[in-house]
Amino acid sequence: MNKLKSSQKDKVRQFMIFTQSSEKTAVSCLSQNDWKLDVATDNFFQNPELYIRESVKGSLDRKKLEQLYNRYKDPQDENKIGIDGIQQFCDDLALDPASISVLIIAWKFRAATQCEFSKQEFMDGMTELGCDSIEKLKAQIPKMEQELKEPGRFKDFYQFTFNFAKNPGQKGLDLEMAIAYWNLVLNGRFKFLDLWNKFLLEHHKRSIPKDTWNLLLDFSTMIADDMSNYDEEGAWPVLIDDFVEFARPQIAGTKSTTV
């Protein structure tokens, strides 16, 4: 780091804080991305395995990882971890299976469906994270949570959640399941989340299509406190149009009572 300019050193420090990565990884990633901090950070979160030093994977004990998998594998099907194994996995991590941390791990494992991991998902996911023990995985969780502060990575996580949560073979996501996952992933991110849930339970009562799920994130990031910037002529799903129509009088009523 001594050979770097002061501006580059600042970027290395910022990169390390934001990504929770090592100095070597920071220098490697920034130098490959013309020292553009935003580009380097974005690329790191999209493909961390390209930048994290091979020593992380080199120090991985494959036998130890295999033994860890065997602790959780389904007794009836050795190629997957079933619901009991997932519960044990969460207990070992001291995590609630319904917590966002477990969902983030599933995202990093690229899990296809909830309540199970295939052997490949578990082994590849742990290898990519450089983990061969529960202790190492625990230490990675704050870094994964930090990763979601980058909007592009959160969007990827959010869109993953739809496919993960729905029943295989179904196009839409059951309403109750959609609301449960929205409460998990959009809590603190969508100012109208409670009102949205109320609207769905009172007026929709049907499954949620993928495009509505995906576009709700865009809606949540752009909508003003009074919804005055909503464009009815925009390419929004009908459900979001109907929600705005439902919500505006309630928002106006709330404001008038607080004045």
From Swiss-Prot:
Top-rank taxon, per record: Eukaryota
Subcellular locations according to the entry: Nucleus; Cytoplasm
GO molecular function: cullin family protein binding; ubiquitin conjugating enzyme binding; ubiquitin-like protein binding
PTM (free text): Mono- and poly-ubiquitinated by ARIH2 and ARIH1. Monoubiquitination by ARIH2 is mediated by an interaction between autoubiquitinated ARIH2 and the UBA-like domain. The monoubiquitinated form preferentially interacts with non-neddylated cullins and modulates cullin RING ligase (CRL) complex composition and activity.
Example GO biological process: regulation of protein ubiquitination
Phenotype for F15A: Loss of ubiquitin binding
Keyword Transcription: no
Keyword field: Acetylation, Cytoplasm, Nucleus, Proto-oncogene, Ubl conjugation, Ubl conjugation pathway
Domain UBA-like, first and last residues per copy: 8-45
Free-text tissue specificity from the UniProt record: Expressed in pancreas, kidney, placenta, brain and heart. Weakly or not expressed in liver, skeletal muscle and lung. Strongly overexpressed in thyroid tumors, bronchioloalveolar carcinomas, and malignant tissues of squamous cell carcinoma of the oral tongue. Not overexpressed in aggressive adrenocortical carcinomas.
Gene Ontology cellular-component annotations: cytoplasm; cytosol; nucleoplasm; nucleus; ubiquitin ligase complex
Sites annotated Essential for interaction with UBE2M: C115
Post-translational modification N-acetylmethionine, affected residues: M1
Outcome, altering F44A: Loss of ubiquitin binding
Keyword Nucleus: yes
Domain notes: The DCUN1 domain, also known as PONY domain, mediates the interaction with different cullins. The DCUN1 domain mediates the interaction with the N-terminally acetylated NEDD8-conjugating E2s enzyme leading to the NEDD8 transfer from N-terminally acetylated NEDD8-conjugating E2s enzyme to different cullin C-terminal domain-RBX complexes; the neddylation efficiency correlates with the DCUN1D1-cullin and DCUN1D1-E2 interaction affinities. The UBA-like domain mediates interaction with autoubiquitylated ARIH2 leading to ubiquitin ligation to DCUN1D1.
PANTHER family in the record: DCN1-LIKE PROTEIN 1, RP42 RELATED
Role played: Part of an E3 ubiquitin ligase complex for neddylation. Promotes neddylation of cullin components of E3 cullin-RING ubiquitin ligase complexes. Acts by binding to cullin-RBX1 complexes in the cytoplasm and promoting their nuclear translocation, enhancing recruitment of E2-NEDD8 (UBE2M-NEDD8) thioester to the complex, and optimizing the orientation of proteins in the complex to allow efficient transfer of NEDD8 from the E2 to the cullin substrates. Involved in the release of inhibitory effets of CAND1 on cullin-RING ligase E3 complex assembly and activity.
Oligomeric and partner information: Part of an E3 complex for neddylation composed of cullins, RBX1, UBE2M and CAND1. Interacts (via the DCUN1 domain) with the unneddylated cullins: interacts with CUL1, CUL2, CUL3, CUL4A, CUL4B and CUL5; these interactions promote the cullin neddylation and the identity of the cullin dictates the affinity of the interaction. Binds neddylated CUL1. Interacts (via the C-terminus 50 AA) directly with RBX1. Interacts (via DCUN1 domain) with the N-terminally acetylated form of UBE2M and UBE2F. Interacts preferentially with UBE2M-NEDD8 thioester (via N-terminus 1-26 AA) than with free UBE2M.
Protein name: DCN1-like protein 1
Annotated organism of origin: Homo sapiens (Human)
Lineage, top ranks: Eukaryota, Metazoa, Chordata, Craniata, Vertebrata
